[in-house]
Regions:
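Catalytic cores and adjacent binding grooves of peptidoglycan-active enzymes
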Residues: 3, 14-15, 47-56, 60-202
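Active-site acidic/histidine clusters and adjacent loop/turn architecture
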Residues: 1-28
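Active-site-adjacent substructure of cysteine-protease-like catalytic cores
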Residues: 19-53
Length: 202
């Protein structure tokens, strides 16, 4: 799996990060690699590729400038986040024999699972179907638009930036919401190693 990951990182993840965010990926955070268990952590299920050290669950990408793109939030996040994540998921489908991302089932809502399972049929699994990031980002931008309503402080579709609206014009309650929205996430390195749903902190 290591050589497939290296190819995917070099050929797809880094170019996609440069394209969508203008900086490379500095770190990939995984939530499960080797784990001797059944598929999706379910008792009685077929043995998981994780049990063979042949799978990886990717939860987030940390960019060189410190921004963190989580699969859980970014899959339905800004056009840039969605475009990036769909591009890397689609490219993963070319490198791995199994790719499961949000929308595939309830166990993969917060990560992209990749493995090199060998099937007698020779078939691969790419679920949900790969859609180019450009297509996804254009659809999201069209649905959401980048214009804002009167009185809105003008949060743009890009992550981590707020347009130049004087702070004195913001209502106190909205200042609080913005502060919470842009607060750094808590470190999630303490996730347990399974594919089951994790409670959200919010």
């Amino acid at each position: 799996i290591v050589s497939a990951l290296d190819r995917w990182l070099a050929d797809a993840v880094q170019p996609a990060a440069q394209r969508w965010f203008g900086v490379p990926v500095a770190e990939i955070r995984q939530i499960s690699a080797y784990s001797c268990r059944g598929m999706n952590g379910q008792p009685g299920a077929r043995i998981s590729e994780h049990a063979f050290g042949n799978a990886l669950d990717i939860a987030s990408f940390v960019l060189a400038d410190g921004r963190k793109i989580t699969v859980r939030d970014g899959w339905r996040g800004s056009p840039e986040e969605q475009g990036f994540l769909h591009d890397v998921q689609g490219a993963a489908c070319e490198q791995f024999t199994t790719v499961l991302a949000p929308g595939s089932n309830r166990f993969h809502y917060d990560h992209i699972h990749v493995d090199l399972m060998r099937r007698a049929s020779g078939n691969s699994v790419c679920n949900p179907d790969a859609v180019p990031g450009d297509v996804v980002a254009a659809r999201v931008a069209k649905e959401r638009g980048y214009a804002w309503r009167r009185g809105d402080p003008g949060v743009t579709g890009s992550i981590g930036k707020v347009s130049a609206v004087p702070k004195e014009k913001l209502k106190p309650s909205f200042k609080k919401k913005l502060k919470k929205f842009f607060a750094p996430e808590e470190d999630d390195d303490d996730w347990v190693e399974d594919d089951g749903p994790r409670p959200r902190d919010d």
